Curated annotation (Swiss-Prot):
Keywords: Antiviral defense, DNA-binding, Endonuclease, Hydrolase, Magnesium, Manganese, Metal-binding, Nuclease
Protein name from the UniProt record: CRISPR-associated endonuclease Cas1
GO term, biological process aspect, one: maintenance of CRISPR repeat elements
EC number per UniProt: 3.1.-.-
Key word Metal-binding present: yes
Reported function: CRISPR (clustered regularly interspaced short palindromic repeat), is an adaptive immune system that provides protection against mobile genetic elements (viruses, transposable elements and conjugative plasmids). CRISPR clusters contain spacers, sequences complementary to antecedent mobile elements, and target invading nucleic acids. CRISPR clusters are transcribed and processed into CRISPR RNA (crRNA). Acts as a dsDNA endonuclease. Involved in the integration of spacer DNA into the CRISPR cassette.
Positions that bind Mn(2+): E155, H221, E236
Co-factor requirement: Mg(2+); Mn(2+)
Gene3D superfamilies cross-referenced by the UniProt entry: CRISPR-associated endonuclease Cas1, C-terminal domain (1.20.120.920), CRISPR-associated endonuclease Cas1, N-terminal domain (3.100.10.20)
Quaternary data: Homodimer, forms a heterotetramer with a Cas2 homodimer.
Enzyme class: hydrolase
GO molecular function terms attached to this record: DNA binding; endonuclease activity; metal ion binding
PANTHER family named among the record's database cross-references: CRISPR-ASSOCIATED ENDONUCLEASE CAS1 1
Lineage: Archaea, Methanobacteriati, Methanobacteriota, Methanomada group, Methanopyri
Length: 331
């Protein structure tokens, strides 16, 4: 958990109580007007009085059980009924869903290319710039994809090249060069899997629901079971900067060491969840200019696009953006 000025409270142990117009955790106080989200995980608790304070200040609360989202508490409001109707309309039209999915996937590809370009400059490792160019070339194809399957193909090729390039940067024991999940088969995969599902997803969920959007109606990720399709779509743009970069930095500076992982058959498990959640929350809350502010701005752009039935433009990322995140993690 971060310092009292963090905009997101992520609590795994302890209790959140109300103290006047602030949330109190032990001896620390968090101003309700400065708090933009609360995530309750593990054995953490929150009092009814604190929940009421959150509702009055429109602070969404997400409850986690393991990496699974159990529920969300948000203020009762009629403001977004029309917006939801328009979102349902888009979700019912494959061509409209594709139009909204294209810029999100293109953005995610551009973010990965920017990470590789930054690492090329930072490390001097041969081949990273070429890898960045190869990844970036898939963004234009994604923007012009003629079908959902084609879009997934461009994203998949970009992701494969990106992760293969990251293997040149990370220690051999940490990463195999392939993205694996269910189960993750190496420490880097274990760390980013938790960063995506255990930190970034609930943060985005709280902010998306607060913005009035239906989290289960995605564009690329359609409704399926308990999967929040729209949140998975929105995550695509922020995985690289909000999770991959801080996890990379912590592997390279030794803060994430072999001892923090446990091998169990084919799976690798992260022992110290705070070793990943802390740097991810750091870059979300404390990056100069506000990465979390950029996330909120993007959610508003998507919301406005849904309201107008017009998809947003893709986000642009460059190595300087990655450098700001990297520098925020200086030990």
């Amino acid at each position: 958990m971060g310092a009292p000025n963090d905009t997101v409270i992520f609590l795994r142990r302890g209790k959140i109580e109300r103290r006047e117009d602030a949330f109190r955790i032990g001896k620390s106080k968090y101003s309700a007007v400065r708090t933009t989200g609360i995530i309750i995980a593990g054995g953490a608790q929150i009092t009814t009085q604190a929940v009421r304070l959150a509702l009055r200040n429109e602070v969404p609360i997400v409850y986690l059980g393991g990496n699974r989202i159990l529920g969300v508490t948000v203020p009762f409001s009629e403001r977004y009924a029309t917006l939801r109707l328009k979102q349902y309309e888009i979700a019912s039209q494959p061509s409209a869903r594709l139009a909204f999915a294209r810029p999100l996937i293109a953005s995610s590809i551009l973010a990965r290319a920017a990470v590789l370009e930054f690492l090329a400059n930072e490390t001097g490792i041969t081949g990273l710039e070429d890898a960045a160019d190869e990844v970036r070339s898939e963004a234009e194809r994604a923007l012009n994809a003629g079908s959902t399957d084609a879009l997934r193909g461009y994203e998949g090729r970009a992701a494969c090249r990106y992760f293969r390039a990251l293997a040149e940067v990370l220690p051999d024991w940490a990463f195999s060069g392939r993205r694996t999940r269910r189960p993750p088969r190496d420490p880097f995969n274990a760390a980013i899997s938790f960063g995506y599902a255990g930190v970034l997803l609930p943060v985005l969920l709280s902010r998306t629901v607060a913005a009035g959007l239906e989290p289960f109606l995605g564009f690329l990720h359609g409704p399926r079971g308990r999967r929040p399709g729209l949140i998975l779509d929105l995550m695509e743009e922020w995985r690289a900067l909000a999770v991959d970069v801080p996890v990379l930095r912590r592997f390279l500076d030794g803060s994430l060491s072999r001892e923090m992982f446990r091998w169990k058959g084919d799976a690798v498990l992260l022992r110290d969840l705070d070793a990943v959640s802390a740097p991810v929350l750091t870059v979300l809350s404390r990056v100069r200019g506000g990465l979390l502010e950029a996330v909120d701005r993007r959610i508003r752009e998507v919301r406005d696009g849904v309201s107008r039935q017009s998809p947003p433009e893709p986000l642009e990322f460059d190595p300087e953006d990655v450098g700001v995140v990297w520098d925020a993690l200086e030990v």
